[in-house]
Amino acid sequence: MEERLVSGDVHREDVSLEYSLRPKFLHEYIGQDKVKDNLKVFIEAAKMREETLDHVLLYGPPGLGKTTLAAIIANEMGVHLRTTSGPAIERPGDLAAILTSLEPGDVLFIDEIHRLHRSVEEVLYPAMEDYCLDIIIGKGQTARSIRIDLPPFTLVGATTRAGALSAPLRDRFGVISRLEYYTTEHLTQIVMRTAEILHVDITAEAAVEIARRSRGTPRIANRLLRRVRDFAQVRGDGTITFLLAKEALELLQVDRLGLDHIDHKLIKAIMEKFGGGPVGIDTIAATIGEEAQTIEDVYEPYLLQIGFLQRTPRGRIVTPIAYEHFGMEVPKQ
């Protein structure tokens, strides 16, 4: 699968820059007002009681700021942040090594927590509830269990698939917050902030244009800004204007709703070859040369979000607003 400019997943080029662009405290964090306001209360209450913050689960599409919020929680609590991911913790012993190295009050961030192996999850249960580890030593009849006390800590779990979490794990989180797609207004503020950090001159109109095409996702907004900056330096005088941003994004094949050439190919295949649907996912996959799972997990969510596609028991259907966007007439039934 090719790396898409409008993907919310982390690209290699994002890694080095994202750290420098991340806000460090809640008052610097733009958007997600409900999540932010609730976290502010929970953090202040925990600090007043001189306790650790309850375990926090953050879920939502990629690129919305889950990792950033984990770091902010640690900063606001004045403690260290330890970062790992579900796939990186292969065995219970790996998790035990991480947990026993924590200092009192530390924040442990586990990204993609839905990908934890079940045997690892079971080690996590007593650690989250009672701040202890139950470890089996020996085998067979000589096996015995010993309990190791852990310092109080806060687990922050992040996932794009909350439904994939087991109920016992999900129930152990005291704070569960869903991150929503960002408004154009908030994304415009993020683009302006990033431009200032990167020392890029940009007009307010250009920032709005980049924000509109960013699919509600800060990571995409920052990536598009960097690409448009290249055009401003090579084809302009270094300043990103509305016209330059519009031209650059069209050359990058990102349309006014943030759809790229793959989105166009998928929608147009259903329109032109199957009369707008309904058509099965496997048929679509064979038509555009992609795996059905990739279409469901990567391409469809945003098209469903903006109302261009509908899932029905008989298959996928393209909606009238999608026809309008592409300047085509809705076929008569």
Curated annotation (Swiss-Prot):
Catalytic activity: ATP + H2O = ADP + phosphate + H(+)
Key word Transcription regulation present: no
Enzyme class: hydrolase
Keywords attached to this entry: ATP-binding, Cytoplasm, DNA damage, DNA recombination, DNA repair, DNA-binding, Hydrolase, Nucleotide-binding
Chain positions covered by the region annotation Head domain (RuvB-H): 256-333
Binding residues for ATP: L21, R22, G63, K66, T67, T68, E129, D130, Y131, R172, Y182, R219
Location, primary (coarse class): cytoplasm
SUPFAM superfamilies recorded: P-loop containing nucleoside triphosphate hydrolases, Winged helix' DNA-binding domain
Subcellular localization, as worded in the UniProt entry: Cytoplasm
A Gene Ontology cellular-component term: cytoplasm
Binding site for Mg(2+): T67
EC numbers, comma separated: 3.6.4.-
Binding-site residues, DNA: R311, R316
Region of interest (Large ATPase domain (RuvB-L)), residue spans: 1-182
Molecular function in Gene Ontology: ATP binding; ATP hydrolysis activity; four-way junction DNA binding; four-way junction helicase activity
Residue ranges of the region described as Small ATPAse domain (RuvB-S): 183-253
GO biological process, alphabetically ordered: DNA recombination; DNA repair
Sequence similarity: Belongs to the RuvB family.
Domain free text: Has 3 domains, the large (RuvB-L) and small ATPase (RuvB-S) domains and the C-terminal head (RuvB-H) domain. The head domain binds DNA, while the ATPase domains jointly bind ATP, ADP or are empty depending on the state of the subunit in the translocation cycle. During a single DNA translocation step the structure of each domain remains the same, but their relative positions change.
Role noted for this protein: The RuvA-RuvB-RuvC complex processes Holliday junction (HJ) DNA during genetic recombination and DNA repair, while the RuvA-RuvB complex plays an important role in the rescue of blocked DNA replication forks via replication fork reversal (RFR). RuvA specifically binds to HJ cruciform DNA, conferring on it an open structure. The RuvB hexamer acts as an ATP-dependent pump, pulling dsDNA into and through the RuvAB complex. RuvB forms 2 homohexamers on either side of HJ DNA bound by 1 or 2 RuvA tetramers; 4 subunits per hexamer contact DNA at a time.
Quaternary data: Homohexamer. Forms an RuvA(8)-RuvB(12)-Holliday junction (HJ) complex. HJ DNA is sandwiched between 2 RuvA tetramers; dsDNA enters through RuvA and exits via RuvB. An RuvB hexamer assembles on each DNA strand where it exits the tetramer. Each RuvB hexamer is contacted by two RuvA subunits (via domain III) on 2 adjacent RuvB subunits; this complex drives branch migration. In the full resolvosome a probable DNA-RuvA(4)-RuvB(12)-RuvC(2) complex forms which resolves the HJ.
Protein name: Holliday junction branch migration complex subunit RuvB
Gene behind the chain: ruvB
